[in-house]
């Protein structure tokens, strides 16, 4: 019985975004291609050709082009993907040939079989290149973080370094792009100019973790009419860098803020008149859950987010595949890979000629000098 291929939750999300961004403006059910795309992470070299051929065959069977205007619209979307194709000559040969076919309607109609074959090849070229690049970076990240050949102290240090590196990536790169703020250039007064990409990422990791960007983002969303009260995910993910106090201390203040009404000041009630018992319990439950995560009582790693999978813009913040394309997901994966490499270099043990001593600690060993 063949061993089951390893799967990656991160790559499942990334691959779906890539497929949907490439196939935008094309009338095709992308579910089959998405399922094939997921197989390219941790995929043996012997199977990659079969998976990519499956993607091409699906395109060949399902893609239809009705007129040259539709083709031009598709090409406008595909043009930006040229940066992620390893052989740009291949890309531009196919792309420019398709452009030529839009010269006249008669020429387009006569050559439609050739147009479809060329377009299917171009789409497969883009998808396979982007997916393989993404798979390679995700595999590197996961293997680096999951490596078993590390001491517990090194593993702990690397996980924490990576956690806060990703928080800085969100705070100093992604959130400013979402709200249109200037992106802060990493680096400090008196340091040498940044000479390479790794140094830029290193300085990004050194920037202060506590910033006002999350609150600024909430203000931006509130001005756009989006409800920002569902922020438990930001606490759990570590973006909301604040201490969570006892529920009893702040519950009245939280509820009065949400209600946006005057509090009845009497001996019997400190809650707003238009807040019912059910709403009070929901607020209490939300803060209790946040407190449990903050104190480590719950360590399942689950994070529910207001960012995806919801129907109403007034309650949640929808991020589509086209938005992910705008945020250049492969570039961010590359930044994460460089971060992981920098963290690895920083925490790698160096042979100092000492003696390994076993102790009764969860960390198990320490290094001592030879005496």
From Swiss-Prot:
Cellular compartments per GO CC: host cell cytoplasm; virion component
Organism: Variola virus (isolate Human/India/Ind3/1967)
Subcellular location: Host cytoplasm; Virion
Site (Cleavage) residue list: 187-188, 238-239
Record's subunit section: Part of a complex composed of A30, G7, F10 kinase, A15, D2, D3, and J1.
Pfam assignment, any one: Pox_G7
Domain of life: Viruses
Similarity comment text for this entry: Belongs to the chordopoxvirinae G7 family.
Keyword field contains Nucleus: no
Keyword set, alphabetical order: Host cytoplasm, Phosphoprotein, Virion
The protein's role, per its UniProt record: Late protein which is a part of a large complex required for early virion morphogenesis. This complex participates in the formation of virosomes and the incorporation of virosomal contents into nascent immature virions.
Triggers of expression: Expressed in the late phase of the viral replicative cycle.
Phosphoprotein found in the keyword field: yes
UniProt modification remark: Phosphorylated on serines by F10 kinase, phosphorylation state is regulated by H1 phosphatase. Undergoes proteolytic processing during morphogenesis, probably required for the transformation of immature virions (IV) into mature virions (MV).
Protein name: Assembly protein G7
